[in-house]
Amino acid sequence: MLNHFPGHCSNNIFCFPPIESETKSGKKASWIICVQVVQHNTIIPITDEMFSTDVKDAVAEIFTKFFVEEGTVRISKMTRITEGKNLGKKNATTVVHQAFKDALSKYNRHARQKRGAHTNRGMIPPMLVKYFNIIPKTFFEEETDPIVQRKRNGVRAVACQQGDGSILLYSRTEKEFLGLDNIKKELKQLYLFIDVRVYLDGELYLHRKPLQWIAGQANAKTDSSELHFYVFDCFWSDQLQMPSNKRQQLLTNIFKQKEDLTFIHQVENFSVKNEDEALRLKAQFIKEGYEGAIVRNVNGPYEPGYNNYHSAHLAKLKPLLDAEFILVDYTQGKKGKDLGAILWVCELPNKKRFVVTPKHLTYADRYALFQKLTPALFKKHLYGKELTVEYAELSPKTGIPLQARAVGFREPINVLEII
């Protein structure tokens, strides 16, 4: 859960990123909000388990630090959180979880107030998809049905209004789009009728145009004013726990405020009762020339993609691609259960390399293979072989297959027999 929040831990204290501004005298000022957990007058390490289970005799404390360059640090009084909220309910929070939610709310509120001077100008990274071609059963276990939307193969974009009334349109990686005046002009008109604090999350797209062309237009300072902005979600920085179905209702209300827009559109929602209905819609969308479908858990909160976090409340459905690539090396995973498990390294014709996860090997087999496969055995039996790889898409920047999984070798090879 810690990776849901921006910032880092140091000496058992979690600090959100500093919000910077400038004093009247031109000096740099920094405001930081922090959370710590105290048990028997001792600050203890913050763990992910604390977000689901309370720690006996522990309380959470929120405090802020403010300092001006060449000045002293001022520390606020502690705000103590001694119990969670909504106890006994499905959305109950622990002491620590509630403290982080309160701190994040204050952080976002302060960031918005200082956005003119803040380094990222109030940018919040958009929510990212965790599941690919899998719809979790939990999506259908709630009282309401999940919704399905068309998946466009465009460029992710988030829009918000700045303190001076200007429109900020930025990418998944928090890079500002400098052009797109046709879209910004309509957004400015729309924000005259809606809550100025709302963020609009969507995709820059023009139907049947290739992604490379769309990306080129999106990143140009002077574009051809052909791209459209398809909005599929909205959120408020201080209400990220708002469920998806409520956000969709509010998004519909937003678009009712001004219905004469040309370049901004609300994405259509389809309610489904089971996975088969979702798959039928995916097939329909593909026939229409779209990339596939997005499935949303209507009870899910908006979870920003801080530290590349991917939300378990979103699923993407699209056709798998496959191709043969030359195997040139092997390595292991870097963290968690993938550490010590073999990964294949393939090479593109342009000599760029990418890592591929074996699809049909168990973790036990992958551990054994990495331990016992020597460079000499690899060179003798596997180097230069063609490996069939399934992947979601090619990276528009590098051409490397994304979410690559090795199906098998073109010629029959049992890699476990090699060792």
Swiss-Prot record:
Pfam families: DNA_ligase_A_M
One Gene Ontology cellular component annotation held by this UniProt entry: virion component
Annotated organism of origin: African swine fever virus (isolate Tick/South Africa/Pretoriuskop Pr4/1996)
Function (record text): Very low-fidelity DNA ligase that seals nicks in double-stranded DNA during DNA repair. Together with the viral repair DNA polymerase X, fills the single nucleotide gaps generated by the AP endonuclease. It is not essential for viral replication and recombination. Displays a very low adenylation activity towards DNA with 3'-dideoxy- or 3'-amino-terminated nicks compared to regular nick DNA.
Protein's name in the database: DNA ligase
Record's miscellaneous remark: Consistent with its intracellular location, ASFV encodes its own replicative DNA polymerase and three base excision repair enzymes: a class II AP endonuclease, the repair polymerase Pol X, and an ATP-dependent DNA ligase.
Binding locations of a divalent metal cation 2: E291
InterPro entries: DNA_ligase_ATP-dep_cent, DNA_ligase_ATP-dep_CS, NA-bd_OB-fold, NAD_dep_DNA_ligaseB
Chain positions recorded as ATP binding sites: K151, E203, F232, I294, K316
Keyword field: ATP-binding, Cell cycle, Cell division, DNA damage, DNA recombination, DNA repair, DNA replication, Ligase, Metal-binding, Nucleotide-binding, Virion
Enzyme Commission code(s) on record: 6.5.1.1
Active site (record annotation): K151 (n6-amp-lysine intermediate)
Region of interest called OB domain, as start-end residue ranges on this chain: 318-419
Chain intervals for the UniProt region annotation (AD domain): 121-317
Record field: catalytic activity: ATP + (deoxyribonucleotide)n-3'-hydroxyl + 5'-phospho-(deoxyribonucleotide)m = (deoxyribonucleotide)n+m + AMP + diphosphate
Any one of the GO BP annotations: cell division
The keyword Nucleotide-binding is annotated on this UniProt entry: yes
